[in-house]
Amino acid sequence: MKVLDEFDITDRTKLRLQVGEYRDQERIDIRQYIKVDNEFIPTKKGVNFSSEWLDKFFLMVEKLKDI
């Protein structure tokens, strides 16, 4: 997976945006990472989906502006 961006939630937690391939399909991964022994490791808190769904994902996120 290639890291596109990330930001710190706390000094021990970060949110990371990655892109990569799985079974010949481009995937997007947005996941929370926690620091364990000076290394950030992925948690189950996140979402992984096909890049084919990216336009629909943006439409969903756009609705957050209305709240």
Short names for language-model regions:
Residues 1-67:
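Positively charged, low-complexity terminal tracts
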